[in-house]
Each structure stands twice: as structure tokens, then as C-alpha cells.
Design a protein with these regions (language model features):
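Oxyanion-binding and handling regions
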Residues: 2-4, 8-57, 68-71, 106-145
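Generic alpha-helical propensity signal that fires on short helical segments
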Residues: 43, 50, 58-61, 86, ...
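Noncatalytic linker/hinge segments flanking ATPase motor cores
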Residues: 62, 84, 115-119
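Stable alpha-helical structural segments in soluble proteins, enriched in small hydrophobic residues
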Residues: 62-66, 93-95, 99-101, 120-129
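N-terminal glycine/serine-rich phosphate-binding loop of ATP-dependent small-molecule kinases
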Residues: 62-77
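DPxDG-like acidic metal-binding loop motif
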Residues: 75-80, 85-106
Length: 145
């Protein structure tokens, strides 16, 4: 195949920008983080039933505040530790809806998945999911009896 220099330049200029969204509703506060190529942003909200019901609005408002839309997100990482079943159920429903409607891959992780890792930060989650081969688009619930 022969490419002219202008065609090659066009190919080289096209880059896939990966924007990632981390969601954690298992703690005292709802935590959201956006990881872009250049920046990391995060917010927290009170962990209440009303905020669970408004989670889609909270996510969209957070994205809008950073000049992003849900279509700009390439992957979602969601904590599925068994601490807040209502929060996990609501957030998983929203994430699955994003997956079905926008084809956004999601990864359900638990901090227990990252054995022998210390001082884990939320911005490390995407790389740790890759390292520990967390499967995409699979919900693997953790049950405590």
C-alpha cells in the first residue's frame, strides 16, 4: 500500500483520547473521578438515597463542569465492594445503561482484587484493572454472609 505524505499526516494526527470515569458509592461519600489525557478531576457528594436516585444527574453535571459529555467517556470503573447494596445496585444500573446505549465498557473492581498493592489511589484503578486482568462488562458481585 502506498500512502501519500498528506494521508500519512492525517493518520498520525488521529489519536484516540481515552477519558475514564471512576465511580465509588461504597463509602460514606459518593466519589466520582474523571481521568483525561492531561488532567484528573474528582468530586464527592453525600451518600444518601436522594443522591443515589440523582446519580445520573450528578455524573452529567460533573462531566459538563469539565466540558465533557458521557459520549466522551471510553471506560467506566465501578467499585463493587459489599458495603452499600443500594448504592451499588443503582450505580450498576446506570453504568449498564451507559454500556447498552453508548457502548461504554465498564469494569467492576474491588480493592481486594489488587492483592499486595499498597496505597492504592483512585487514579491507579484503570491501570490496576489492566494489570490484574479485571474483565470488562462483567459484574462479579462480592457477597458477605
Amino acid at each position: 500500500m502506498i500512502l501519500f505524505s498528506s494521508a500519512l499526516e492525517t493518520i498520525l494526527e488521529y489519536k484516540i483520547i481515552m477519558n475514564k470515569l471512576v465511580i465509588d458509592v461504597t463509602n460514606e461519600k459518593i466519589f466520582l473521578m474523571i481521568i483525561t489525557k492531561d488532567d484528573i478531576y474528582n468530586i464527592t457528594k453525600e451518600n444518601t438515597k436522594i443522591n443515589y436516585e440523582k446519580l445520573t444527574i450528578i455524573i452529567n453535571d460533573f462531566l459538563s463542569s469539565k466540558n465533557l459529555k458521557i459520549v466522551d467517556i471510553n471506560a467506566i470503573y465501578i467499585n463493587n465492594e459489599a458495603r452499600s447494596f443500594a448504592g451499588i445496585r443503582n450505580s450498576l444500573s446506570i453504568v449498564k445503561a451507559f454500556n447498552v446505549s453508548r457502548k461504554i465498557d465498564y469494569y467492576c473492581y474491588s480493592f481486594n482484587d489488587f492483592k499486595d498493592q499498597k496505597d492504592i489511589k483512585y487514579e491507579d484503578i484503570p491501570n490496576l484493572c489492566d494489570k490484574f486482568k479485571i474483565k470488562k462488562n462483567l459484574i462479579n458481585p462480592i457477597y458477605i454472609s
